[in-house]
Amino acid sequence: MNTVHVNVVTPDGAAFEGDARMVIAKSVTGELGILPKHIPMVTPLDVSVLKLRHEDGGRTLIAISGGFMEVRPDTVTILAETAEMADKIDYDRASAAKVRAERRLQDTKLSELEFRRAELALKKAINRLSIRDMKE
């Protein structure tokens, strides 16, 4: 078998469990492609779209809001704050969140912490919306 078992877990429980030929994830230092028998590693993940390529040529797209990835030769475990499958994303809600975050960022009275939170909210909304353009 030329696959790696993938588990995507959030505080709410398992978001995905299955096998993939390749896992493409964005760490805080850049994009990583994980194949079966990869050397063990742990890396922090950025807000991004996790891409799983399957043996049948299909793919699974999952919007994650950061977290950590543990890689073993036969297993990849993603621990994420949130994880949404592409077909479960409410794009109207994500668009509204983007508009709210953009408005908050225009407020000149925000503290540094509030500004960073608004930036993160915008990044998450843009990430969720970006999957729509990636769908086949």
Curated annotation (Swiss-Prot):
SUPFAM superfamilies: Epsilon subunit of F1F0-ATP synthase C-terminal domain, Epsilon subunit of F1F0-ATP synthase N-terminal domain. InterPro entries: ATP_F1_dsu/esu_C_sf, ATP_synth_F1_dsu/esu, ATP_synth_F1_dsu/esu_N, ATP_synth_F1_esu_C, ATPsynth_dsu/esu_N. It is found in: Cell membrane. Keywords: ATP synthesis, Cell membrane, CF(1), Hydrogen ion transport, Ion transport, Membrane, Transport. Its main location: membrane. GO terms for cellular component: plasma membrane; proton-transporting ATP synthase complex. It comes from the Bacteria. It is a peripheral membrane protein. GO terms for molecular function: ATP binding; proton-transporting ATP synthase activity, rotational mechanism. Coiled coil: none annotated. F-type ATPases have 2 components, CF(1) - the catalytic core - and CF(0) - the membrane proton channel. CF(1) has five subunits: alpha(3), beta(3), gamma(1), delta(1), epsilon(1). CF(0) has three main subunits: a, b and c. Produces ATP from ADP in the presence of a proton gradient across the membrane. Belongs to the ATPase epsilon chain family. This is ATP synthase epsilon chain. The lineage of its organism: Bacteria, Bacillati, Bacillota, Bacilli, Bacillales. The gene is atpC.
